[in-house]
UniProtKB/Swiss-Prot annotation:
The gene is bilQ. Residues 54-77 bind DNA. The keyword Transferase does not apply. The lineage of its organism: Bacteria, Bacillati, Bacillota, Clostridia, Peptostreptococcales. InterPro entries: BilQ, HTH_MarR-typ, WH-like_DNA-bd_sf, WH_DNA-bd_sf. It holds the Pfam family MarR. PROSITE patterns: HTH_MARR_2. This is HTH-type transcriptional regulator BilQ. Keywords: DNA-binding, Transcription, Transcription regulation.
Length: 148
C-alpha cells in the first residue's frame, strides 16, 4: 500500500480517524459530567450487566484488577455507580448504576444519537443500515486477527 494514499485506501486508517473524531466529540459533550471516554464505557457495561463484579469488568475490558478498581472508585466517587456487598460472598462486591448514573446514561444515549444522526444525513436509510451491518462484521474480525 502506498503511504501517500493511506488515508483513502486503508480501512484501519479511516477507523482510527473516526475513533479520534468520536473521542473528541464525546470528551467535549461529557466534560460537564467529568466522564472520560474510558469511564463511560464502564458505566454502559455496568448498566447492561447489573450486579456484575470487579472481575467481570476486568475480564470484559481486558485490564488488570488495579486499573478496574481505580476506575470503579472514580465512578463511585462521582455518584454514578454503587458497590453492594455480594450476598453470596462477603469479600466481593456487585456493581450497580445509581439514579444519577441512569440520568447520565440517558444523556450519553442522546450524545451517541446526535453523532449517529449527523452521519446518517450522508446516507440513505438502506446505505446506513448496510454500513452498520458491515462495521459489525469488521468489529467481529478482531478475534480472528488476534488468533493468527
Amino acid at each position: 500500500m502506498d503511504f501517500k494514499n493511506l488515508q483513502y485506501e486503508s480501512l484501519s486508517y479511516i477507523i482510527c480517524n473516526l475513533q479520534k473524531n468520536f473521542k473528541l466529540y464525546c470528551e467535549k459533550c461529557l466534560k460537564p459530567y467529568k466522564l472520560t471516554n474510558g469511564l463511560y464505557f464502564y458505566l454502559i457495561y455496568i448498566n447492561k450487566n447489573r450486579n456484575c463484579s470487579l472481575n467481570d469488568v476486568s475480564t470484559e475490558f481486558e485490564v488488570d484488577k488495579a486499573h478496574t478498581t481505580r476506575t470503579i472508585s472514580r465512578l463511585e466517587q462521582d455518584g454514578y455507580i454503587e458497590k453492594i456487598q455480594n450476598p453470596n460472598d462477603s469479600r466481593a462486591f456487585q456493581l450497580r448504576v445509581t439514579d444519577k448514573g441512569e440520568e447520565v446514561l440517558g444523556d450519553i444515549k442522546n450524545i451517541f444519537s446526535k453523532w449517529d444522526n449527523h452521519i446518517k444525513k450522508e446516507f440513505s436509510d438502506t446505505e446506513y443500515k448496510e454500513l452498520v451491518k458491515n462495521l459489525h462484521v469488521v468489529k467481529d474480525i478482531k478475534t480472528a486477527v488476534e488468533e493468527e
